[in-house]
UniProtKB/Swiss-Prot annotation:
Compartment(s) where it occurs, according to its Swiss-Prot or TrEMBL record: Cytoplasm
Gene: scpB
An annotated GO BP: DNA replication
Organism: Clostridium tetani (strain Massachusetts / E88)
Superkingdom of the organism of origin: Bacteria
Protein's UniProt name: Segregation and condensation protein B
Lineage: Bacteria, Bacillati, Bacillota, Clostridia, Eubacteriales
Length: 189
């Protein structure tokens, strides 16, 4: 698609806000800057500027949604303070929550990624096949390749869904293991 060089003024900026908001809403998934830019036929620099303004506007306004950036992609999400109402709507039940084994497995994948099933099993001390399958089904982890050793075991890493689920923009926002250890030690006191 051909990109146009619009002069961004208040009128067409509002029009781009509207178009981008519609795209993000209809998509339901994060959209990359380049994709948005191509669809609205605007250069990436101006598109990024509009997206940043949109993020600020959503923060200021008393709305139920906000625009977030996750690993250089943009998505409309509900505000955290409304999560209890969303849960009621979706009637979240305990069968949808993660088991202790799945949480342990997810933690290992998050901190050691990319990681093989054997690595996870060794750290947990038990088999993790079922937990890995659950996490794959819930799209919290994904297969990201194979290790170049005999048997070529599958490598697992976390997904964008993992980041969204835990309110992170990047895996770098995870607390360090040292911080977690410190926190647990303080709780024990």
């Amino acid at each position: 698609m051909k990109q146009m060089n619009y002069i961004i003024n208040e009128e067409n900026e509002l029009r781009f806000f509207s178009i981008i908001e519609s795209l993000l809403f209809a998509s339901g998934e994060p959209l990359g800057l380049k994709d948005i830019s191509e669809i609205i036929e605007l250069n990436t620099l101006d598109t990024k500027e509009i997206l940043q303004k949109m993020i600020r506007e959503y923060e200021i306004e008393k709305r139920g949604i906000k625009l977030i950036e996750i690993e250089k992609k943009y998505q409309l999400v509900t505000k955290e303070e409304n999560s209890c109402f969303i849960e009621q709507l979706l009637k979240t039940n305990s069968s949808q929550s993660l088991s202790q084994a799945a949480l342990e497995t997810l933690s290992i994948v998050a901190y050691k990624q990319p990681v093989t099933r054997v690595d996870v099993d060794e750290i947990r001390g038990v088999k993790s096949d079922r937990a890995l399958q659950t996490l794959l089904q819930k799209s919290l982890i994904k297969e990201t390749g194979r290790l170049d050793v005999p048997g070529r075991p599958i490598l697992y890493s976390t997904t964008e869904e993992f980041l969204k689920h835990f309110g992170l923009e990047s895996i770098k926002e995870l607390p360090s293991l040292e911080e977690l250890l410190e926190e647990f030690q303080e709780e024990d006191l």
